Amino acid sequence: MSTFAFLLFCAQACLIQNVCGLYLGGLGGCGCGGGWNGWNGLGGGWNGLGVGWNGIDGGYGAGCGSYGGEGIGNVGVAGELPVGGVTAVGGRVPIIGGVEYGGPACAAGAVSICGHCAPTCGCGRAGLGGYY
């Protein structure tokens, strides 16, 4: 097999993985119930929808703008990822799959993550606007 044919085969495999991988495992990692003894439940407590710390348009003035994005890939961080000062991300932050933290995730100040998931994330709670 020539080098060009091998590279063409690899490019086609990547394209097929990109197209078919969008719909595989869409419910992986998105639970339908509240986790952490109800802290992430649907209505009250920490990160609830409407009441509690960092609820949607709730405590500390943390409002939620629109979110949308998609992507496939792996991001690996080995070691430290220090961030000093203010870090703002404007635009899209595409995440498909699971997000896992091994060890402590320390933060000083206010940290809020708001967004809108696709219909499969959070089991498509249409009555709540799909917020997860």
Swiss-Prot record:
Q: Name any one GO molecular function.
A: structural constituent of egg chorion
InterPro entries documented for this protein: Chorion (IPR002635)
Q: Signal peptide: which range, if any?
A: 1-21
Region of interest (Right arm), residue spans: 114-132
Central domain as annotated region, ranges: 66-113
Task: Report keywords, A-Z.
Answer: Repeat, Signal
Top-rank taxon, per record: Eukaryota
List every stretch annotated Left arm: 22-65
What is any one GO biological process for this UniProt entry?
A: chorion-containing eggshell formation
This protein's GO CC annotations: egg chorion
The UniProt family comment states: Belongs to the chorion protein family.
Instruction: Describe the task this protein carries out.
Output: This protein is one of many from the eggshell of the silk moth.
Name of this chain's protein: Chorion class A protein L12
